[in-house]
């Protein structure tokens, strides 16, 4: 979210600012006295949207009110930390508070709620207002829900993608081929990106990877990578890292490549929704803005993955490639096994330990993660003509085995601010098999829920460590998994859910 910079409007009464040290995540909030003369003259009430003006800087915020003089006097306005930072004020400065201009693009949101398709202009207006911070979480939820109830068609998806690109920065690289990769998600522990970037960059291709934080999963790539190295890179730092090492693994929200998407993601996380059209627009807007020419898309398919069957995966792949082609981006979609978690760790730090094990060729490194990363890296190497058709996976495995991938990963981490050790949880508790038998099913959705209740991704060390895989023969009382938590409260939440959730790991006698 950014502050608007615009000419000052008609002179309005001013109020002295007070910093409340109130943390409201990304949403600017202001607090005013119920008897404040501005509230009376402007007709402002609690939860009104207000426009704050400090010189040329303007911020849209949500108003809350207080009685009495214990918190604020009648001539003061209290600011949350987000509002304070966006306005760029100092204690005692004066700002103007007024009604904001009418939010015209909401008419298009209402049309979408009632089942009407939106054209490029309508979507562009919505996205511009979202990026400018004019949409509240209620407005955002309405748009996202309407886009889920009546899924975006191909034209809407392409128009939304273009609108999201238009409000952000774009990068260009002095290379004929710039590769990227993305996983559509829904599969716990599938942390291939750091490995893929290391392999691809070690072979001389350019891969400026910007990744998101978790939306509905226990960890996103940025969450995991953050336990190993800084990911909040500004545009200049990102460019320096890529020019020096050929690749990076950075948080996309820090570089303003698709700022509207970062706002959408925050509300999608709270709604626990991730629809096809929004997913495609989110992924492609960031890849195109990052200057990519080619992208490999990992689509895990499984009974409890995000994509349940091959027909659905083929439809998604077709839609991705069709929309990407409108922007000159070549997309290669790879269907992968989504029947069970990848690797052993689920949660930022636990997944980071798996990544390190694969890159360092540890004897106990999860082989499924190694092979999946090699498959995806191989596709990128073939696209970039570093390997012949059908030979990319072998080159990727060779790059891991001879240590070049680990050396490149170390160099990327150092360039981003330094390699560090992931944290370990203070509390670890096993969930054991109630009977002997064979593991026949692992519920990815329940497993992700368990890891999130254990604190992931906010608690970096929280999550789940898997001890079994499909087909394993196990004894009664043998650990199926271990829950990792940073606090006793998070551990209790997770264990309570595990007791009520039914079979997370299904055993057949």
Swiss-Prot record:
Its EC number is 2.4.2.4. One of its GO terms (biological process) is pyrimidine nucleobase metabolic process. Keywords: Glycosyltransferase, Transferase. One of its GO terms (molecular function) is 1,4-alpha-oligoglucan phosphorylase activity. It catalyses: thymidine + phosphate = 2-deoxy-alpha-D-ribose 1-phosphate + thymine. It is an enzyme of class 2 (transferase). GO terms for cellular component: cytosol. Belongs to the thymidine/pyrimidine-nucleoside phosphorylase family. Type 2 subfamily. HAMAP family: Thymid_phosp_2. This is Putative thymidine phosphorylase. The lineage of its organism: Bacteria, Pseudomonadati, Pseudomonadota, Alphaproteobacteria, Hyphomicrobiales.
